[in-house]
């Protein structure tokens, strides 16, 4: 029987929703040397001594399959116009040669990305959104202003879903920038992750950002990962492999719909659900400001530890969005 957790799109708000605790979680997480700060997995000595690369990635049906998305350490899915979603993907431990399709910046991206430092790449955007992104600590690499040749238009894709970035070369050119700080806490191994030890079995996670379609994550024990589907079909990368995540974190967020573009509010706190290893637990998310990392806490205020591996963060609107957990 499905457990309905967030209101919107006909999903009722059930009594098992995550409590909002009064205390914040522990201070910003740290990782020991030799551990990838955005993934919690081992890296070769010196292998993390370069900046992270955040890129705005298209999720329009015409943009799929995306390039390099399966190798991102972290992927944020955010609501944009027309009920569609777009990704803010961050690469650090494994940077592909190419990523894309690259799209424009949105008003919530400074709040999402400021804590990473490093580089942010995007195609352009409304002047006020570009100015806000340029005001962050990140180095901005913009297709509309590019004279370096780092961006190209792919001949086998239609505009505007055709802008591709030379990701590894972008990082190499700016290797003097600092590596990112850790954003989440990680357990020593998958079996020790908090959701595994304290959560309830979850076979499928269904999230809805609007009436325009949904996406699902199905637990695959053989793959030791959640496999992603979108609009009723497997969500594939350019090699034909289904996108997957070690951790799926759903944040219930407010959305400012007063302008032409919806703006996710990612400061403050709210309900969350953390899924790892086929289990899910309720949580509370905290973000003290744009430059602060997201913190995840259980009902007692203790820090939640993710399993080492990649993480997708679903920024589900509190008004028109919904999340459904299927045991």
Regions found by a protein language model. Name each.
Residues 12-15:
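C-terminal motif of bacterial Sec signal peptides marking the signal peptidase cleavage site
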Residues 32-72, 81-90, 95-327:
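A surface/extracellular/periplasmic glyco- and lipid-processing/surface-interacting theme
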Residues 17-20:
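Bacterial signal peptide processing site
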Residues 1-4:
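Bacterial N-terminal signal peptides that target proteins for export
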Residues 24-32:
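Ser/Thr-rich, Proline-interspersed low-complexity disordered segments
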């Amino acid at each position: 029987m499905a457990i309905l957790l967030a209101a919107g799109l006909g999903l009722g708000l059930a009594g098992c929703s995550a409590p909002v605790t009064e205390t914040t979680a522990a201070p910003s997480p740290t990782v020991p040397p030799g551990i990838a700060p955005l993934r919690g997995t081992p890296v070769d000595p010196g292998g993390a001594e370069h900046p992270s690369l955040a890129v705005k990635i298209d999720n329009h049906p015409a943009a799929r399959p995306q390039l390099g998305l399966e190798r991102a350490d972290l992927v944020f899915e955010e609501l944009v116009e027309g009920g569609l979603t777009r990704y803010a993907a961050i690469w650090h431990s494994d940077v592909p040669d190419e990523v894309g399709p690259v799209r424009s910046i949105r008003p919530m991206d400074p709040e999402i990305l400021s804590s990473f430092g490093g580089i942010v790449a995007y195609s352009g955007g409304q002047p006020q959104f570009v100015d806000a992104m340029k005001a962050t600590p990140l180095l901005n690499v913009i297709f509309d202003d590019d004279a370096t040749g780092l961006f190209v238009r792919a001949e086998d894709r239609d505009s505007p879903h055709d802008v591709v970035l030379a990701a590894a070369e972008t990082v190499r050119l700016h290797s003097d920038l600092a590596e990112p700080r850790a954003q989440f806490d990680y357990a020593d191994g998958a079996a020790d992750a908090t959701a595994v030890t304290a959560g309830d079995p979850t076979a499928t996670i269904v999230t809805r950002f609007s009436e325009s379609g949904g996406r699902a994550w199905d637990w695959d024990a053989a793959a030791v990962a959640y496999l992603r589907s979108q609009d009723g079909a497997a969500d594939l990368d350019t090699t034909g492999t289904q996108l997957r995540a070690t951790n799926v974190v759903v944040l219930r967020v407010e959305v400012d719909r007063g302008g032409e573009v919806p703006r996710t509010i990612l400061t403050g706190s709210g309900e969350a659900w953390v899924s790892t290893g086929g289990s899910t637990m309720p949580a509370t998310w905290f973000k003290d400001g744009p430059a602060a990392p997201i913190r995840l806490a259980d009902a007692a205020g203790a820090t939640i530890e993710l399993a080492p591996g990649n993480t997708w963060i679903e920024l589900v609107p509190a008004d028109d969005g919904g999340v459904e957990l299927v045991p």
